[in-house]
């Protein structure tokens, strides 16, 4: 175990090629496996980009280095200075002949979870030992794809003229209604954790910043315990002025489509590691109305009346019928939040949309109400008190342009891109009713 | 007031050039000012990218449109279809002859804060009416520069092989010590809001993800009320494995330098709007030791003994002496957090650094302790109980590589880039002891 490392890494495993035969490299990582066969030892070193085989014949490396290597155990952290030896039979066409070894840190054994194990442990055990679970290439692949997706989303939004903002997560009053909020003790006062940046991004539409986005945590004190919900999530939020629901849907299509393309082009190795069939969606997604959606559900034997929110069963029935990504539009005003703009001709329906992937809702958006009187009326209609919305409502009095926006769940979008069934697979340290650690 | 807009914007004000003489455009924004001089009306329309002059001679626009325009008031939201008329005497060399007007929304008057006013109101009034305050180009410029900075920071980190992560803000136990935490009621349990992603990003160093970054809110229940502190802030955090403090400082220099360059190159207009002298820093920043720093302070008559943290007075004295950006290194171990790696030769000092801009600390970092026994010993030495760190400590038992990292305050960095004296100028909706709204 060392306090100060002798070297710096010169190459990740994936950067070494057989053509580098004879070249000296320094590699660093974890002992993925070690096998001593008499006078030769095989060590597989694992780093972020893959694995590399180190072959140490006693005769070539000498007694001292040989016995040093022999003492290594699984998951020890090592640095190896060695020579690249092209070898057609070795994995990736080369192996490393070690010249010098530094044991950087050792691993206690047995491990509570073995990263080299083929059969994965139960999810709960894995989450308890997330730092070991994350050593498995399949698990790391999910988070590399997630990072790529976030990068792609921001690039699309920058290109579309959006400005990044940070809105507060500590808020004074119960807002929006609907979802439960977590209360905080804020000095002498009570405050709450923001369930979404909705009211703030709308207020920003009155500023002339025009197009804003934020990627940040949201907090929902909902009691349900499903494979699609967490109490802390990462939300990709946009809001755009001088725009309607159709404009917002166009941006959402670009964001989602480009993320698929960027993951496909830049994360081929991770897609392969996950062993998934990765297909690019069309550039434009199907659009069905709420009416059509409930017709599909009813036709499949799931009873649902007009005006009801889609039950889990209805979502599943519709998801079976629809392929990949699709919008559901023209929702009943009754079941959408107070700030949703009603349709001009038929105020019973509104300019809201959900973006679905099969049976999973990944985004929700709408054109919002920008007219003060209509907004106050709608707040009251939902049984809420306009007095709780003073600051928000102020922004609608002095020149608020029409605007629209959406929230896209980063965790759920990662589920779609990596084809995971449980949202906990796509969050490093998930938070649910039961789990608040690590 | 309209529910559905007739048109979409074809050009922002800044996109229109005198060479477009005769071309038809649709512009949208707020009535910045209106002046009727008998049979001619001048309207200045303001959008995100600037202002444009609309000139409406009664004789040319006709009675109906003329009287429509005459009724406009300050801060009404309008769309104008008009013709570009090159005119050397007009601002930017052109004006717009209106052909058609749509009043999209009206503004109640008087305004609680006038965006067109030359003399700004008190900060408190401005923050109360932030949506109006943000209509002022000088205020918007700060947030455009902030967005540019965040984009630049991420680009540098992507280029340096960092992966973006999201760590939880809801945490189970009082961690780190030092700063006060906000308690949350989490279903049946008590939880806390994360004061920094420190322990999580360190745990991730045991995973092999190697280089991670996160830009996210942090929450500190500190009681002080200064121009440099907020209770909710945005922190840019990185952590890198197989690295020491010097490696982390190199990355920090690149991140900060590149952000200066990107703001300088891409936000010239905003720099001009702010009226600031914007100078690029050198690529490498000066480095002084803590010992040298207290010598400077003492020489300037600020009494400070070795082992004390730098007082505000000491920071000011040192800031007067040092120019621009500089590191302070080799801090006494006593005054740095428990996870800071002590120096091999002299454990009284440690591998910590602060990045200062004049008298403002904008970043703090260190090589961390990766050795389990030393870490436990240090936790105890600081009077903390290792039992409170179970999950964190587990990650150090099974192969933790040496690692280093830093946190860079996004709000403070924005202060530096925009030359603001109060952190509240650089946060859309600041949170302090007194302010929890809007």
UniProtKB/Swiss-Prot annotation, chains A, B:
GO MF annotation list: aspartate-tRNA ligase activity; aspartate-tRNA(Asn) ligase activity; ATP binding; magnesium ion binding; RNA binding
Main function: Aspartyl-tRNA synthetase with relaxed tRNA specificity since it is able to aspartylate not only its cognate tRNA(Asp) but also tRNA(Asn). Reaction proceeds in two steps: L-aspartate is first activated by ATP to form Asp-AMP and then transferred to the acceptor end of tRNA(Asp/Asn).
Cofactor(s) this protein cannot do without: Mg(2+)
Catalytic activity, EC: 6.1.1.23
One Gene Ontology CC term in the entry: cytosol
Cofactor, how bound (note): Binds 3 Mg(2+) cations per subunit. The strongest magnesium site (Mg1) is bound to the beta- and gamma-phosphates of ATP and four water molecules complete its coordination sphere.
Main location class: cytoplasm
Binding site for ATP: 220-222, 228-230, 361, 409-412
Sequence positions that bind L-aspartate: 176, 220, 364, 368
Residue(s) at site: Important for tRNA non-discrimination: 91
Protein name as annotated: Aspartate--tRNA(Asp/Asn) ligase
Subunit structure of this chain's protein: Homodimer.
Record lineage: Archaea, Methanobacteriati, Methanobacteriota, Methanomada group, Methanococci
Catalytic activity line of the entry: tRNA(Asx) + L-aspartate + ATP = L-aspartyl-tRNA(Asx) + AMP + diphosphate
Example GO BP: aspartyl-tRNA aminoacylation
Residues annotated to bind Mg(2+) 3: 361
Record-stated family: Belongs to the class-II aminoacyl-tRNA synthetase family. Type 2 subfamily.
Binding site for Mg(2+) 2: 361, 364
InterPro entries associated with the record: Aa-tRNA-synt_II, aa-tRNA-synth_II, aa-tRNA-synth_II/BPL/LPL, Asp-tRNA_synthase_2, Asp/Asn-tRNA-synth_IIb, NA-bd_OB-fold, NA-bd_OB_tRNA
Organism: Methanocaldococcus jannaschii (strain ATCC 43067 / DSM 2661 / JAL-1 / JCM 10045 / NBRC 100440) (Methanococcus jannaschii)
Gene: aspS
